[in-house]
Protein backbone atom coordinates (compact mmCIF):
# COMPACT_ATOMS: atom_id res chain seq x y z
CA UNK A 1 0.00 0.00 0.00
CA UNK A 2 2.85 2.39 0.76
CA UNK A 3 4.33 1.74 -2.67
CA UNK A 4 1.08 2.75 -4.39
CA UNK A 5 0.85 5.90 -2.27
CA UNK A 6 4.42 6.84 -3.12
CA UNK A 7 3.82 6.16 -6.80
CA UNK A 8 0.66 8.29 -6.79
CA UNK A 9 2.40 11.19 -5.02
CA UNK A 10 5.27 11.03 -7.52
CA UNK A 11 2.78 11.19 -10.37
CA UNK A 12 1.07 14.22 -8.81
CA UNK A 13 4.44 15.93 -8.41
CA UNK A 14 5.29 15.39 -12.10
CA UNK A 15 1.90 16.67 -13.23
CA UNK A 16 2.14 19.78 -11.04
CA UNK A 17 5.66 20.50 -12.35
CA UNK A 18 4.42 20.22 -15.93
CA UNK A 19 1.50 22.56 -15.24
CA UNK A 20 3.75 25.12 -13.56
CA UNK A 21 6.21 24.96 -16.47
CA UNK A 22 3.51 25.56 -19.08
CA UNK A 23 2.06 28.41 -17.00
CA UNK A 24 5.45 30.13 -16.78
CA UNK A 25 6.40 29.49 -20.41
CA UNK A 26 3.28 29.73 -22.57
CA UNK A 27 5.40 29.72 -25.74
CA UNK A 28 6.13 26.03 -25.26
CA UNK A 29 2.46 25.24 -25.88
CA UNK A 30 2.24 27.60 -28.83
CA UNK A 31 5.21 26.03 -30.62
CA UNK A 32 3.34 22.75 -30.99
CA UNK A 33 0.09 24.25 -32.26
CA UNK A 34 -1.12 23.83 -35.81
CA UNK A 35 -3.15 26.47 -37.61
CA UNK A 36 -5.48 26.20 -40.58
CA UNK A 37 -3.27 28.49 -42.65
CA UNK A 38 0.04 26.66 -42.11
CA UNK A 39 0.42 26.16 -45.85
CA UNK A 40 0.41 29.92 -46.37
CA UNK A 41 3.20 30.38 -43.82
CA UNK A 42 1.16 32.77 -41.70
CA UNK A 43 1.10 32.88 -37.93
CA UNK A 44 -1.41 34.42 -35.58
CA UNK A 45 1.15 37.07 -34.58
CA UNK A 46 1.44 38.31 -38.17
CA UNK A 47 -2.10 39.69 -38.04
CA UNK A 48 -1.08 42.16 -35.32
CA UNK A 49 1.08 45.23 -35.77
CA UNK A 50 2.98 44.89 -32.47
CA UNK A 51 3.42 42.66 -29.42
CA UNK A 52 2.04 43.69 -26.01
CA UNK A 53 3.97 43.71 -22.71
CA UNK A 54 5.01 40.27 -21.38
CA UNK A 55 4.07 38.49 -24.62
CA UNK A 56 6.52 36.52 -26.71
CA UNK A 57 8.31 38.59 -29.33
CA UNK A 58 10.76 36.10 -30.83
CA UNK A 59 12.36 36.16 -34.26
CA UNK A 60 9.57 34.00 -35.68
CA UNK A 61 7.00 36.72 -34.92
CA UNK A 62 9.12 39.47 -36.45
CA UNK A 63 7.01 42.18 -34.80
CA UNK A 64 8.22 45.00 -32.54
CA UNK A 65 7.06 45.56 -28.98
CA UNK A 66 4.10 47.99 -28.82
CA UNK A 67 5.88 50.19 -26.25
CA UNK A 68 8.99 50.46 -28.40
CA UNK A 69 10.98 48.48 -25.82
CA UNK A 70 13.47 45.89 -27.05
CA UNK A 71 12.56 42.23 -27.23
CA UNK A 72 14.50 40.56 -24.40
CA UNK A 73 15.68 36.97 -24.87
CA UNK A 74 16.75 35.09 -21.70
CA UNK A 75 19.29 32.28 -21.84
CA UNK A 76 16.45 29.75 -21.47
CA UNK A 77 12.85 30.43 -22.46
CA UNK A 78 10.92 32.65 -24.82
CA UNK A 79 11.83 36.18 -25.84
CA UNK A 80 9.42 38.71 -24.29
CA UNK A 81 8.56 42.41 -24.42
CA UNK A 82 9.46 43.89 -21.04
CA UNK A 83 7.75 47.30 -21.04
Swiss-Prot record:
GO CC annotation: extracellular region
UniProt-recorded Gene Ontology molecular function terms: ion channel regulator activity; toxin activity
Keywords: Disulfide bond, Ion channel impairing toxin, Knottin, Secreted, Signal, Toxin
Signal peptide boundaries: 1-23
Compartment annotation: Secreted
Domain of life: Eukaryota
Annotated S-S bridges: 50-66, 57-71, 65-79
Residues cleaved off as propeptide: 24-48
Tissue: Expressed by the venom gland.
Function noted in UniProt: Probable ion channel inhibitor.
Family: Belongs to the neurotoxin 07 (Beta/delta-agtx) family. 03 (aga-4) subfamily. JZTX sub-subfamily.
Domain notes: The presence of a 'disulfide through disulfide knot' structurally defines this protein as a knottin.
Name of protein: U25-theraphotoxin-Cg1b
Amino acid sequence: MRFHTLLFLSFLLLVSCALICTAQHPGLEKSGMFHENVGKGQHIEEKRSCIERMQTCGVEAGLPCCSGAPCICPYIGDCICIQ
